[in-house]
Design a protein with these regions (language model features):
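Short, hydrophobic alpha-helix immediately C-terminal to the catalytic nucleophile
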Residues: 43, 85, 108-109
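Short glycine-enriched nucleophile-adjacent loop
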Residues: 104-112
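Short beta->alpha connector loops
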Residues: 36, 102-105
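Alpha/beta-hydrolase fold catalytic core
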Residues: 1-29, 51-54, 92-94
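N-terminal low-complexity, intrinsically disordered patches enriched in charged
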Residues: 43-44, 72-75, 112
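Conserved HGGG/HGGXW glycine-rich cap/lid loop of the alpha/beta-hydrolase fold
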Residues: 21-66
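Active-site loop/oxyanion-hole signature of alpha/beta-hydrolase fold enzymes
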Residues: 11, 51, 61-98, 102
Length: 112
């Protein structure tokens, strides 16, 4: 399944790059990678999940992959969490959050 490259606005206006797959009307699943990785870490998983009828979003976290680096050098858990919430708010419906390592911690903080 072909992915569409999408740029989301993160916390503090950062541009965060993602690959989006699947039906735009389906429930979104937001995949967040670990530190030092990129959105491609979730690529094959996202393809499998999208083929099951979900809309998948694999995101490059701030300072990773094709996403912006934070000009104020804020790479705190608070900032990663705020980016997660900002992207989730742009998806049209609440996403399922899936994360590993840094992405997992960010997802848990976003869920409260």
């Amino acid at each position: 399944m072909e992915a569409e490259r999408v740029v989301f606005e993160g916390f503090e206006g950062l541009h965060l790059v993602a690959d989006v797959r699947g039906d735009p009307e389906a429930t979104p699943v937001l995949f967040l990678h670990g530190g030092g990785q990129t959105r491609y870490a979730w690529g094959s998983t996202a393809e499998t999940v999208a083929a099951q009828g979900w809309r998948t979003v694999t995101l490059d976290l701030r300072g990773h992959g094709d996403s912006d680096w934070a000009p104020n050098q804020d790479y705190s858990f608070t900032a990663f969490c705020a980016d997660c919430v900002a992207v989730a708010d742009q998806l049209g419906q609440p996403p399922v959050l899936v994360g590993a390592s840094l992405g997992g911690m960010s997802a848990m903080l976003a869920e409260g």
